[in-house]
UniProtKB/Swiss-Prot annotation:
The gene is rpsU. One of its GO terms (molecular function) is structural constituent of ribosome. Belongs to the bacterial ribosomal protein bS21 family. One of its GO terms (biological process) is translation. Disulfide bonds: none annotated. GO terms for cellular component: ribonucleoprotein complex; ribosome. Pfam families: Ribosomal_S21. Keywords: Ribonucleoprotein, Ribosomal protein. It comes from the Bacteria. This is Small ribosomal subunit protein bS21. It comes from Picosynechococcus sp. (strain ATCC 27264 / PCC 7002 / PR-6) (Agmenellum quadruplicatum).
């Protein structure tokens, strides 16, 4: 779970920016979008194959 502790002299905008950065690094939004609809086994295999190809070329 992502947490951000706001300091006394810290404004809420910077804390919100830190929170958004942590959430995007953790991949929470991508996971939510992926789980929004049922993914068939074929779609899952295709997604994983694309991820493997991307990882191999980095």
């Amino acid at each position: 779970m992502t947490q951000v502790v706001v300091g006394q002299n810290e404004n809420i905008e910077s804390a919100l920016r830190r929170f958004k950065r942590q959430v995007s690094k953790a991949g929470i939004f991508a996971d939510i979008k992926r789980r929004r609809h049922f993914e068939t086994p074929i779609e899952k295999r295709k997604r994983k194959a694309v991820a493997r190809r991307k990882k191999r070329f980095r």
